[in-house]
Amino acid sequence: MAGAVPQFMVDEYVLAYHGPLLYEARVILAEVWDESNTLLGTVGPHYFIHYKGWKQTWDEWVPESRLLKLNEAGFAKRRALLDAQAKKGRSTGGSGGTGSPGAGKGGLKDKKKDTKKRGRDAMESESDFMKRPEVKIVIPDVLKLVLVDDWENVTKNNQLVALPRKPNVRELLEEYRQYASASKKQERSDRATALLSEIISGITLYFDKALGNNLLYRFERAQYVEQKRQNPEKPMSEIYGAEHLLRLFVNFGPFIAYTNIDTESLNILRDYINDIMQWMIKEQKRLFMKEYEETTTHYQNLSRS
């Protein structure tokens, strides 16, 4: 369907309406339907989702209107719906009826237990999310200027980062790992030194997972789709470079909120990211593209369709 741009991506965690409430779910498939291929009678972006903690028999296709981003605003909406549902339950007295023939009281009780359990799970999940430590990554002023130029080149000048980049994300992070191992800063703890390789691998994995969902401007999506088509087995960390890695660091705080990581490891991770950015400043002329690639009129029209 022309002009339809999916707001959610495969493997993204979301909040999904099921009945009157919102539940955590994961996007398994994403498709844009039109009148010729719709399965539900609706057109536009649709998603096949799996509800967290539910059996696969509940997996289903839903339109985009059934989904919300998994963030504080989404949790606020879910909390409001839970409160409204609780008030509604109190107002009806909870005595219920005799149920449908053959259902029996046991069936009704089981249904109520199931609903209550899902409600508790939702509240516990939200509570856990709100308790997770926040990671604040401070971007150095020098790199903020790089980000501004990057944004203007892509969104204002209709230019692109030429791909594949050299060095790519995987290569430059390996360069940093070797640099950090050789420097062995005295203030770095033994645990921090031991975690270096694991953290580099983790950042690379985050990049591969986040790029398509969170790190691209709309104008870059057609280029991304083409790269995926040409390199179906190649991770994006072997195609994209410093420009997009820097965008990851800008968004790293919210990403970490969705992981189970202890405070000490969190601080070590933050310190390494800060150190990586300082190293990137030293290597700025080599790592960042000086001139972006001009695009054709055809590409510009394609990216806006």
UniProtKB/Swiss-Prot annotation:
Residues 91-106 have a biased composition (Gly residues). The keyword Transcription applies. GO terms for biological process: chromatin remodeling; DNA repair; regulation of DNA-templated transcription. SUPFAM superfamilies: Chromo domain-like. Keywords: Chromatin regulator, DNA damage, DNA repair, Nucleus, Transcription, Transcription regulation. It holds the Pfam family MSL3_chromo-like. It is found in: Nucleus. It comes from the Eukaryota. Residues 14-67 form the Tudor-knot domain. GO terms for cellular component: NuA4 histone acetyltransferase complex; Rpd3S complex. Residues 131-304 form the MRG domain. The keyword Nucleus applies. Residues 86-127 are annotated as: Disordered. Its main location: nucleus. Belongs to the MRG family. PANTHER family: MORTALITY FACTOR 4-LIKE PROTEIN, MSL COMPLEX SUBUNIT 3. Component of the NuA4 histone acetyltransferase complex. Involved in deacetylation of histones, chromatin assembly and chromosome segregation. May act as a transcriptional oscillator, directing histone deacetylases to specific chromosomal domains. Component of the NuA4 histone acetyltransferase complex which is involved in transcriptional activation of selected genes principally by acetylation of nucleosomal histone H4 and H2A. The NuA4 complex is also involved in DNA repair. This is Chromatin modification-related protein EAF3. It comes from Cryptococcus neoformans var. neoformans serotype D (strain JEC21 / ATCC MYA-565). The lineage of its organism: Eukaryota, Fungi, Dikarya, Basidiomycota, Agaricomycotina.
